[in-house]
Amino acid sequence: LFNHTTLIIIITVIISLLAWQNKALFNRLIFYPPAVNNGQWDRFVTHGFIHADSMHLLFNMFTLYFFGRAIEGLYQSFLFGYGFVVFYVLAIIIAMIPSYLKNKKNASYLSLGASGGVSAVLFAFILLAPWEKIYLFAVIPIPAILFAVAYVAYSIYADKRGGSNINHMAHMWGGAFGVIATIVLEPRVLSHFINALLSPSF
């Protein structure tokens, strides 16, 4: 079934493939603070549609495919049916803001990938189904809520440690946006989450 999750994946794959073939396009779309400071604010969005390599793209798109389809219906009643698309794009933008503020004058800072948006989708799913199994490395079953706790803890640790090209801060803020935006749009989700959390099912 064709849905907005599938549409986002198709667009992301096409743009990522084109950017790999065209270095000038890749450099124009990647998040680069000096360029943003010069008025290229669109990079807050465009960086989320390119990826470093095929594994980076595959991991993000597989995660988006499985969890996006599961939660997309919740947002369809908003913004003339485009609520999920807006939710996803806003997550990419908002997840990058803390990194931008931290690296505003850093001419060597670069960031790319859909991780902020994908994290928002993943955490919105966890809010709706906290005890649903998430398969770590595609084989190890772990309850969604435990995965969320470990994910946040690791993101904070890895961000403080540094030395990696992965934007762990964007993962964390994307996840936070996913939770907050979902509760704002549908406040009943919070009581559903609490009730589900208190009634674990394994």
What do the predicted segments below correspond to?
Residues 1-202:
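A detector for small-residue-rich transmembrane helices and their helix-helix packing motifs
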